[in-house]
Amino acid sequence: MKNLILLEGGSYRGIYTSGVLDVFMEHDIYPDCVMGVSAGALNGLGYVAQQPGRCRDVVLSYGMDPRYVGTKALRKEHNLVGFDFILRELQHVLPFDAESFYDPARKFYVGVTNCTTGEPEFISRDHCSDFLTAVAASCSMPYLCRKVKLNGEYYLDGGASSRLGLEFLDQHPEYDRVVVLLTRRMSYRKKKPSGLMR
């Protein structure tokens, strides 16, 4: 049997996911594979690197910093969200265990939306030369962030095409035990947009 954990996105609601993953790490619970969409991709970084508390510390210490989301991010990175700040600069303050993260025993994928097809795609850490850019693509919300170019294709937030990344299961039937971490209740259904938003 192979185990998989799917991590839903949800922006700041992802703090719930980071708490659940911290408890998993405290109890040495690690699956064969992790797949994260949007904020779930960010949470997956700390989980796969086996760094309890790191994702929580990033959000609680820097989540309101204008370099994280806001005017400084917009000026410096031309994005409302400062992915370079979150994924690269913060490593100097909150060290990231890259050696543990890149351990081939742990599989990690992020869900993205292909801007040409509008379909979800799943990028493997093991087959991507710039995986942190793939994580940024997974979190790049339409209209708020620029499209991210990776391997000649443009991508945006994985949640735009697949909130949970369930299509991953069709592409990877080898995972027969699946845990899905949600940031909303199972009964949640998104309301139809009104007026001009349709």
Predicted regions and their residues:
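Patatin-like phospholipase
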Residues: 1-37, 45-198
